Structure formats: structure tokens, C-alpha cells
Amino acid sequence: MDTTELRIDTAGRHVLDLTDRAAAFAARAGGDGLLCVFVPHATAGLAVMETGSGSEEDLEEVMGRLLPRDDRWSHRHGSRGHGADHLLPVFASPSLTVPVQAGRLLLGTWQRICLVDLNDDNPQRRVRLSFLSGR
């Protein structure tokens, strides 16, 4: 298994496209297999989605309605509404798997791999990429 860890500075951005970095890693690994992407954080997740057409803003708006940043949450440590951050991985899984053929991600035309992080308390994130060869 080939693996690497990306260090991401979210710097107030809530949806970050990781596709190019994931594709470069898969190309270096080469061959056929599975790319596993994992976020080792309790307040961030991953999504496969279209980007650049307003979908990022739509996702933020929907998540804001589903998980408002107020004091309703039982989980209360951290900043106001931090309990909502701990529910995000229920909607945006901390892991996903993408098939790879001849070193290329087999994503659909408009599909991108995105880090989803609505938590402003921790701008430093890690993302683990692992390539499982089909050999």
C-alpha cells in the first residue's frame, strides 16, 4: 500500500477541492486499484461533488440550515455552535474510495473530491491518501 498525508490550511474556506492532489498521487502510484481518502478529524468530512458552479456555496448554505451554529447542541465545548461541527461527518463521511485504472481516477465528468470543513476553530487539517493496488 502506498500512502501519503496532505496538510491542508483551510483558512476560512469551507469546501476545498483535493482532486488534483489525489490524481497526482494516484498517477505516481500507477496501475489499477483503489484510492482511499481519509480525514482523521471529528469535525471534517469528504464529498464527491461538482465544483465551480456554485455548489460549494449551496452546500455551505444547506449545512448551515441543517447544523446551525448556535447553543442548541448538547456538545458544547469550543466556540459557539461547535457541537454542530461534530455532526458534520454524519453528512460528509470522513472517508471515501475512488477506483483507479492505469493511474487515473475513475471519477465522472463533473465529480471532484472535496474536503468539507465548517469548523473555523482548527484551520489545519490532515488528509490521508492511500493507494491499494489491484495487483
Q: Whereabouts are the PLM-identified features?
A:
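Active-site histidine-anchored catalytic micro-motif
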Residues: 1-135
